[in-house]
Amino acid sequence: MRLLRASVFLAFLFTLAAHAEKPWPIRAVIVTTFETGNDTGDAPGEFQFWVEREHLDQVLPFPGGVHPLRTNKDHTMLGMVSGTTLVNATASMMALGLDPRFDLTHAYILINGIAGIDPHIGSIGSAAWARYVIGDVAREIDPREAPKDWPYGIFPTSAKQPNPPSIEDPVWHRSNLFTLNQSLVQWAYDQTRSLKLPDDPAVAAFRAEYTNFPAAQRPPFVLLGDTFASDYYWHGTIMTTYAEDWVKLWTHGKGVFATTEMEDSGFLNAIDRLDEMKRVDRNRVLVLRTGSNYSMERPGHDAVESVSAPYVGRNLALESAYLVGSTVVHNLVTNWSTTRDHIPGS
């Protein structure tokens, strides 16, 4: 009985100590969406290069997430794998932001992953800094039942046809337009625009098949371009036109569709709520997506073949994501005496 009481008392003291421990003041959060196999030593997903090259060696349980967290020995850089799709992105970000182990009030959050890229705007292996994140809340009818002059069957919830002249984002769903800190995004772009990104002969040969798409044929480069998040894994010429129109519509002509992915509006929705709770600072968020594949088929091929093909640029995109993202993160964390209280570019 005495042993039981002692065990209970020690457990109570341990709980008090855990709650009393000061949260770690994180400087940078690296947000990725998937990893394949192990975090180190095998074929990489989005997380592995960060783990290996930034020495995120300490593994932390993450009960509200889908994958353990990792941190460096100084507890200044924190890495998360969110899981793919909007629901996982939102839930994982909320779980991280509410975790009492971490002080994220001054942390810079880098959302860093691969994506489809619009061949009108960029090439496989290229890296796009987003100024806007656009969501996919919409109405849709099968285009076979749509009027013949409709370009596609998707349109805003407050409209009666695709691509109306203008739109307002209804407050109640808070999910289709997220504007990032333009000054910080421009600063990040300026820090990386001259980087020489890795290339690959096989990828270069594939790019060359995108005739009449000069941006798609370029070697990998850094650009400013916005991202469209959707739980639909869509593909093709018609859907790329839809995405281009959709981004332009929701940003009132200021945005340019560059990349397509399945998470970022979920991340930003959670971050907005965490910002209102004083858990994070939404002005310290960056979104970097790199092209692993094109969002539409190359000339002379069809969309089904294209969407079903392996990603020829996956490894290239992963390397670009780390190179460009880490360049900015290193600048932020090594100049912490300045960047802690003063956001670059502002």
What are these regions (language model features)?
Residues 1-5:
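Positively charged n-region of N-terminal signal peptides that target proteins for export
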Residues 21-346:
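Accessory terminal and edge-of-domain segments that mediate assembly/interaction
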Residues 7-15:
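Bacterial N-terminal signal peptides
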Residues 14-22:
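Bacterial Sec-dependent signal peptides at the C-terminal "C-region" and cleavage site
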